[in-house]
């Protein structure tokens, strides 16, 4: 399974080298009050949510000043429904999820503050993605790492774009 490589998860499974770093972004309604936000400071006071047990909910939402943080949603589709139905002003998620959401929900707008001083503060551990394997399965881990080493950043970006295009959120 592909997931963030955290110290806690490393206690249970082994991971390949990271193959993707997931930018953290916000989704708002294109005609909503936060559509022109240029950084997280512009999101102050927003009603927001995200998916449970994610860096988006646990680390990013608390960085929005005076945010009204709703209970965490059980899934990405649930958080998108919360935004689309007007229950919240914004959700925080990763770039692939947001890109697919904008295909499925054309009235949503993706806000990417990456590379600015006013972005969400996260560690590499919170955004790096690797393939988890059963602890101690070094044969599989070595083969996966060998395969990953043959791919370029452009290869990973192309595969991510292809995956976004065919995932259920994109099949509107």
Locate predicted features.
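Proline/Glycine/Serine-rich low-complexity intrinsically disordered segments
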Residues: 1-172
């Amino acid at each position: 399974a592909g997931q963030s490589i955290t110290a806690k998860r490393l206690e249970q499974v082994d991971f390949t080298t990271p193959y993707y770093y997931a930018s953290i972004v916000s989704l708002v309604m294109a005609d909503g009050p936060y559509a022109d936000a240029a950084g997280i400071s512009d999101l102050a006071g927003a009603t927001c949510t995200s998916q449970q047990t994610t860096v988006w909910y646990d680390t990013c939402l608390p960085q929005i000043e005076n945010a009204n943080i709703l209970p965490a949603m059980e899934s990405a589709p649930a958080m998108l429904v919360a935004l689309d139905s007007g229950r919240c002003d914004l959700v925080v998620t990763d770039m692939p999820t947001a890109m697919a959401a904008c295909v499925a929900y054309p009235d949503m707008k993706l806000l990417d503050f990456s590379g600015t001083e006013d972005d969400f503060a996260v560690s590499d551990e919170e955004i790096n993605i690797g393939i988890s394997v059963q602890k101690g399965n070094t044969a599989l881990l070595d083969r996966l790492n060998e395969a990953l080493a043959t791919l370029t950043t452009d290869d990973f970006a192309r595969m991510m774009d292809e995956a976004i295009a065919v995932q259920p959120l994109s099949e509107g």
